[in-house]
Amino acid sequence: LEPCCHQGKTPPCTDIIIEKKIARVFVGSMDSNPLVAGKGVQILRDHGIYVETGILEEECLKLNEVFYHYITTKTPFVVMKYAMTLDGKIACATGDSRWVTGETARAQVHRMRGRYRGIMVGIGTVLADDPMLNCRVEGGVDPVRIICDSNLHIPLASQIVKTASEIETIVACSQEALEAERKQEKIRKLKEAGIQLIGTEGAHGVNLVELMKKLGEQN
């Protein structure tokens, strides 16, 4: 990634490169951050440092795709995970089947949970499976659990609510549900359990576009 040239959470990379008198710099991909966006390369060249850009650019763009997505959209990079049979089913009609995937795929899912900042499901999954949505890989970090629950149907006795003080948990609902008088007692109990509530505007459940923007603001 192009060396940064602004003061953020860390000092400018360009300053230390100049200070250490590094003669040549090879850049894979340019920084899409408007605070950098080519300025880092120009500063180095202005100080007589040889800079070559575009080294393995496609590979670098892929490597940094999460960063590029966030820095240009200010919304989370989302990966969809789903499992289904060859005929397009995810479970038996009776609900008897527990696993569609095998052990290898399930292990990969938990590795993904350890790598990604959050995991999102709908209220239907919570009601049907009462999941923990934690990371079960040794040394892994539990992701932030995000539940899309338009009308706040999440049971207070669910695993999600009972463990919200241990694992960061967000419940996204409609703004209407968040402001409804009849929901205030439940909202109080959810907050006491350690759950953060996010309301979104919209006539058809949780507004995912608005939710992504609000989640991005929490980074």
Name each model-derived stretch.
Residues 33, 37, 53-56, 71-75, ...:
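Short capping loops/turns at secondary-structure boundaries
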Residues 20, 47, 193, 218-219:
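Residues at alpha-helix termini
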Residues 41, 55-83:
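Proteins enriched for Cys/Gly/acidic motifs involved in redox and nucleic-acid/cofactor modification
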Residues 69, 79-86, 90-218:
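Active-site ligand-binding patch in enzyme domains
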Residues 1-59, 144, 175-179:
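Zn2+-dependent cytidine deaminase-like catalytic core
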Residues 29, 64, 94:
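Short, flexible helix/strand-to-coil boundary loops that buttress conserved ligand/catalytic motifs
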Residues 36-37, 63-64, 132, 209:
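Short Asp/Glu-rich motifs
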